[in-house]
């Protein structure tokens, strides 16, 4: 699910950069590897990431309130396929429900809420691009996502870390959240 809040040409950031520009939320360190189906690391894979802020809004929904490109960034995997960045633990939020979508949800007796998640578009030269999310598994809406985007393979372990040494290593406040998520890219056919 791409969703309506993706922005083309987001800021290209170095690994380890902090995407949170409004200072709200619980610190989160996100890391993982990008590999081929054979398990080889993919250097230079492009990871376009975005999420809502701690109030449940994307920057494009709050122009003039949130900084532009808040909680957005484009990262490139390192030689070992690794990537990492700093953000905030995602929150659930309601999708806009003041139009036809809202009427449909009401008729179906469904709520408009999405469980907490991070968005990714991941691709590399010679590989198929994937558009996906990773979800917080214990979110209240995990079993009733308004857009039916949750799959078991997209549930990630968001772990609360209380370790001043690790917090200093990642340049985040202690305690903080940490999530590791790895991607496997298939080669382009033809």
Give, region by region, the residue ranges found by the protein language model.
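Beta-strand-dominated extracellular/periplasmic modules and repeats
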Residues: 1-190
């Amino acid at each position: 699910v791409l969703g309506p809040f993706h922005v083309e040409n987001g800021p290209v950031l170095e690994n380890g950069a902090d995407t949170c520009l409004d200072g709200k939320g619980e610190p989160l360190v996100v890391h993982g590897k990008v590999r081929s189906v054979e398990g080889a690391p993919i250097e230079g894979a492009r990871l376009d990431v975005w999420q809502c802020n701690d109030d449940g809004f994307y920057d494009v929904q709050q122009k003039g309130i949130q900084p532009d490109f808040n909680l957005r960034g484009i990262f490139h995997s390192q030689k070992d396929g690794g990537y990492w960045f700093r953000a905030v633990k995602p929150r659930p939020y309601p999708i806009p429900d003041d139009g036809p979508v809202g009427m449909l949800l009401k008729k179906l007796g469904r709520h408009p809420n999405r469980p907490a998640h991070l968005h990714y578009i991941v691709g590399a030269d010679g590989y198929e691009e994937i558009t996906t999310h990773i979800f917080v598994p214990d979110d209240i809406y995990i079993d009733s996502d308004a857009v039916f985007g949750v799959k078991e393979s997209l549930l990630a372990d968001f772990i609360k870390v209380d370790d001043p040494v690790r917090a200093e290593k990642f340049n985040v406040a202690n305690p903080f959240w940490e999530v590791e998520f790895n991607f496997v890219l298939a080669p382009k056919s033809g």
